[in-house]
């Protein structure tokens, strides 16, 4: 079968860009999974699992490198970008050096892969993304994670809106101005390009596109980008957004047999409703089992990519309990591998419920509380949870951690911009907001408290979705001033709902623990208080 005109055009453009000879270099554009498997298996250590997934390894870097992320400081975007520890500036000269370094590396390869696909399921807002890389595993990963074009769309794809140059096998030059290591992940909003050097971790590509959408959607379209999962009721079409950091239950709780999954990680809220940014899921694998998370377990099959896992070399069976390489074992698969996925992944209904998830190891936050609009802004900007032992090197006891908008590493603009947009959209569409603690109750993790059982959290969500929880009688939790329901139907013990009344060491000890956590909130919020209203500041804990 002869290549299409667009196929030739895309390849010719890349050849011209890099100065490649047709005789020396093979370019594969939107190659099928079977072909990418064949190429990937030529790399050392790559294998196929007994379930049919491609097993690949990302080298030394098994997670993102946030300290090495940079935004090019240039005139079109510099007044919008939230500069600081999250978005460190680099000069246009440094960008040019690193982009050319990436191109130089790609010129040395005998195979180059192009993935042309979309970010954003709503055709009104989607962007055309081109990924250029040298590893078949990276090509399959992004084929899964982006929205795959139809044959007709691919033939008429044209020029991309944004291009990722992934030369991650090749290090950055540490003598280049502004380099702090051999890794750099750089985004240029003027050129609409991204360069990766010194890391083969595939998640950098996915989260790079996310950062781009965090910029383009609010700035160009007044569309709110969110680090959230989303689902929709099968009968009532009601949409729920779930915000939460790693380990809070965002993926688990959005997978509901009575609801359709719109997406598990990245979404946008427009004037028309909610749409997923991605065409796939990037699920954590540590501790995965068919019993606990059957939909994810069964999605690991031919076409999926297993990253940095340990397997039995004789049977090719994966050991999901083994974290020898990293705690951050992952699998990337197309979203249609999830039976409950809503395809296309968008809803023309606005969210009825907003759920902020936290895993509070101090045990002082209630299992559920109803939030006022100002409290939503405060807790959304705070983005609190507890970092559990084992999630990062050196963490041996739970630590309080804050990540603004529940996605600080990916934000392009000041957090207050996203929080204000969220509050405006919630007010316009009369959405309810809830803070759900999936962490400890009765006492802290350290003092022997118990984690809130998943069945009770699911019962709370059922009461939110059927509207009964909004009608319950409420009482106020002091200091944090949270509204706590006195009952959640007959599925959740009433004694579980108010931590001040069920604290194992008594109310005085509870109050002491509340004040300790409240102080952490107040200290963290000092970063944002210059742009916060008095009402939002008053919505936080009052000591």
Swiss-Prot record:
- What is the top-level taxon of the source organism? Eukaryota
Write the lineage as a comma-separated list.
Eukaryota, Fungi, Dikarya, Ascomycota, Saccharomycotina
Family membership, please give it: Belongs to the phosphoenolpyruvate carboxykinase (ATP) family.
Q: Which residues bind ATP?
A: 244-251
Keywords, A to Z? ATP-binding, Decarboxylase, Gluconeogenesis, Lyase, Nucleotide-binding
Q: Which Pfam families match?
A: PEPCK_ATP (PF01293)
Q: Does the keyword Nucleotide-binding apply?
A: yes
Which of the seven top EC classes does this enzyme belong to?
Answer: lyase
Can you name one GO molecular function term for this protein?
phosphoenolpyruvate carboxykinase (ATP) activity
One Gene Ontology CC term in the entry: cytosol
> Carries keyword Kinase?
no
Which GO terms fall under biological process for this protein?
Answer: gluconeogenesis
User: Which EC number(s) does UniProt give?
Assistant: 4.1.1.49
Give the protein's recorded name.
Phosphoenolpyruvate carboxykinase (ATP)
- Organism the protein comes from: Kluyveromyces lactis (strain ATCC 8585 / CBS 2359 / DSM 70799 / NBRC 1267 / NRRL Y-1140 / WM37)
Pathway recorded for this protein: Carbohydrate biosynthesis; gluconeogenesis
Spell out the Gene3D superfamilies in the cross-references: 3.90.228.20, Phosphoenolpyruvate Carboxykinase, domain 1, Phosphoenolpyruvate Carboxykinase, domain 2
